[in-house]
Swiss-Prot record:
Gene3D superfamilies: Ribonuclease Inhibitor
LRR repeat intervals: 149-170, 174-195, 202-222, 234-255, 259-280
Protein name: Leucine-rich repeat-containing protein 42
Species this chain originates from: Rattus norvegicus (Rat)
Pfam families named among the record's database cross-references: LRR_6 (PF13516)
Keywords tagged on the record: Leucine-rich repeat, Phosphoprotein, Repeat
Chain positions found as Phosphoserine: S399
Gene name of this polypeptide: Lrrc42
Region (Disordered): 374-406
Family per record: Belongs to the LRRC42 family.
């Protein structure tokens, strides 16, 4: 006991109480003589002298460290002191849901304002770039909010995004503008067939410039509109330029687009251009434009909606994946075989489009505005000639030969194509 009291490391524990025979006694009073012989006790310290605080971070486990500090917001005061405050409960819940956004059952009926914040939080965490989980999460939003997620999609020259994120692109609904120029789709591409689905019946502007399309692709794209009266029935603008495999026969499939106001068929494989102009004017009222139309300069078609930044993330991921390929020789050999240029950081231009625009004039068509009611009336002779022409056309339509022609207008390939829907 004496050794303990005389120890230099002794720290005063304070008063000590002992209960004896039902009475409480202070032991320190009995040790007054001993205390007097000792040196003055040192003041009680919570930490020894020289104690310092050091902020240590375990860099090996960033996730665990993030979970510990994610509940606080660190700010600096005017004096330069670090101050932290707790996040709101809404922010904590929003962060937790965005980390597990792919496990949400449904967002139908959820407020749009909260859903937009949830979408932005998941986008900041790059949840939509994850394979599998990103697609499931994106489908939940597109099913509930449609055009709010994306109303306009521009994939011009982004053939890598189309190849890598095809299912994600197909999940978008209620698009009004879609630009797939210079994506090398071809007639048998899955995305071309997806254009005829009911989910994209809202598309009014479609750009398919330089996509290796032919008459077969145009026939497939217009089959639902021609027979079932569904699909791209609301289309008002169509760009089919720089597809040299489209001939005069393929243009005939476009007559089913009754709402079409602008059409670009420059650089196609037309032989009788004058006959095509007359047919377009007669069937759907489109007139050849002598000057380039501003609707086809691609300045108005942009990616708009909540997911506009996600498309950029997809592009960065796709380009990075191509750069990280360890064995580029097979790809270079394939590019040499197909006479394609090597990938560069800059977006790919359409050399085919430039050659066609330089070699021949543009074939762009537009719908003339209806004449104003204040314009002078037509003469009686012009009225009679129009009436006579209309009666002759009615007689031709009512004849049995014309009825037979209507029945035979669909080929066997068309019926096979329609049966596949």
């Amino acid at each position: 006991m004496a050794y303990y009291l005389n120890s230099e490391a002794h720290l005063d524990p304070g008063p000590i109480y002992v209960r004896e025979n039902g009475q409480l006694h202070m032991v320190s009073l009995a040790l007054d003589g001993v205390k007097n012989s000792l040196q003055k006790p040192r003041p009680f310290r919570l930490f020894p002298k020289g104690f310092s605080v050091e902020l240590c971070m375990n860099r090996e486990d960033d996730t665990a460290q993030k979970e510990k500090t994610d509940h606080f917001i660190f700010t600096y005061t005017r004096e330069g002191n670090l101050r932290y405050s707790a996040k709101s409960l809404f922010s904590l819940v929003l962060g937790f849901i965005s980390d597990n956004v792919d496990h949400i059952d449904s967002l139908i009926g959820f407020p749009e304002q909260i859903a937009e914040k949830l979408f932005s939080a998941a986008e900041a965490r790059q949840k939509f770039t994850e394979p599998g989980a990103g697609l499931r999460a994106l489908q939940k939003f597109t099913e509930a909010y449609g055009s709010l997620v994306l109303c306009s999609l521009c994939l011009r020259n982004r053939y890598l995004v189309v190849a890598e994120k095809l299912e994600e692109i197909k999940s978008f609904r209620e698009l009004t503008r879609l630009d797939l120029s210079c994506c090398w789709l071809g007639d048998e591409h899955e995305l071309l067939e997806h254009l005829t689905n009911e989910a994209l019946s809202s598309v009014t502007q479609l750009h398919l410039k330089d996509n290796c399309l032919s008459d077969a692709g145009i026939r497939k794209m217009t089959a639902p509109v021609r027979v079932l009266k569904r699909g791209l029935e609301n289309l008002t603008l169509l760009d089919l330029s720089c597809n040299p495999e489209i001939t005069d026969a393929g243009i005939g499939y476009l007559f089913s687009f009754r709402k079409l106001n602008c059409l670009d068929i420059s650089g196609t494989g037309l032989k009788d251009i004058k006959a095509v102009k007359d047919k377009l004017r007669t069937h759907i009222g489109l007139v050849h434009s002598k000057v380039p139309l501003k609707e086809f300069d691609h300045s108005n078609c942009k990616t708009e909606g909540w997911a506009d930044q996600i498309v950029l993330q997809w592009e960065r991921v796709s380009v990075e994946a191509v750069r990280q390929r360890k064995d580029p020789e097979p790809r270079k050999a394939a590019q040499y075989f197909y006479q394609k240029r090597a990938l560069t950081e800059a977006s790919r231009k359409c050399p085919l489009a430039e050659t066609h625009m330089n070699s021949s004039g543009k074939l762009q068509f537009y719908r003339e505005k209806a004449p104003d009611c204040h314009e002078p009336l037509l003469s009686q002779e012009s009225k009679k000639s129009k009436k006579r022409a209309f009666e002759e056309s009615e007689q031709e339509q009512s004849s049995p030969q014309s009825a037979k022609q209507k029945c035979v207008c669909l080929a066997v390939e068309d019926w096979d194509l329609l049966n596949s829907y």
